[in-house]
Amino acid sequence: DPKEKLWLQDKMEPIKNQPSLTAEEKKHILYKLIQAENFEKFVDKKYIGHKRFSLEGSETIIPVLDMLLSLAAAEKVDEVVLGMAHRGRLNVLANIIGKNMQEIFSEFEDISDVDSVEGSGDVKYHLGSSGVYETMYGDDINVSVASNPSHLEFVNPVVEGIVRAKQQMMNDSLKNKYIPVLLHGDAAIAGEGIVAETLNLSQLKGYSTGGTIHIIINNQIGFTTSPVDARSTVYASDVAKMVQAPIFHVNGDDPEATILVTKLAYEYRMMFHKDVVIDVYSFRRLGHNESDEPAFTQPVLYKAIRNHPTVKNIYQEKLLSEKVTDTSE
């Protein structure tokens, strides 16, 4: 669509894709990265060997979701509904949904509340939750993450159905009050047919939710499989080309760049009510789960990863060099 292309050009070319953030916004990004990293470190030390499918190596996803919710709250969106698999789910529940940490840790210890509603007995990284998120600007927004099975990407049409139902029940004819956000793994988005099926429904009158924001946690590995052995396309996001969705490839070690494309993706969705993709290139610091030793199957890759600093440390050093913050903070 020429109008969409012109709109994107007008947004990107004048600023040469260079982010412009205030000192407070930069500090807030660092704060969210610290939250994300500290959660993983604490769980790693406290519950050694427990499966948690950590977000380590891809922590920038937390500031991305924070920015999405901040933008949505500022425009009085009623609710953002998230769909995601196991990777980073506990981190999102803790730092985005606001699920009580005590509840999360009790699930590691297999402590259940006998007085609560009958539970599913499902594993902790499949459970959904809802909460109210307070943004850095002081706004509140409802946010929920749908429960999901082990079947990757199966949650996609479920989230779309949840959002569509809310839009219809609340007479949200403009589809601006309820927004679906789907997080994918790079191997899963390319490998699961349900992704293409759901994309195919995105512009149909009977199924459309006014555009979905897709975020790929692209850690460049699927369990033990390299991208070259996992898909026939160059990019994991190529499936989204079937609906001509804009795709933004961004370096997960550059939080400011990811925030820039997050703003762009959100604005595009609200302007054109179509799907849009943020492809965050990152890595997986640990194995597929915490009992897996990835160096057995990917020795060269994991030698490089073990020598690579965390995104929090990279960004912290950047802000120190810019004198945006100091060591006392």
Walk through the language-model features, giving the residues of each.
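Residue-level detector of anion-binding/catalytic polar loops
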Residues: D78, P246, D275
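Hydrophobic/aromatic ligand-binding patch that stacks against planar heteroaromatic rings
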Residues: L204, V239, Y268
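Acidic, Ser/Thr-rich peripheral helices and adjacent loops at domain boundaries
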Residues: A230-S237, Q298-A304
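Active-site or pore-adjacent capping/gating segments
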Residues: T258-E329
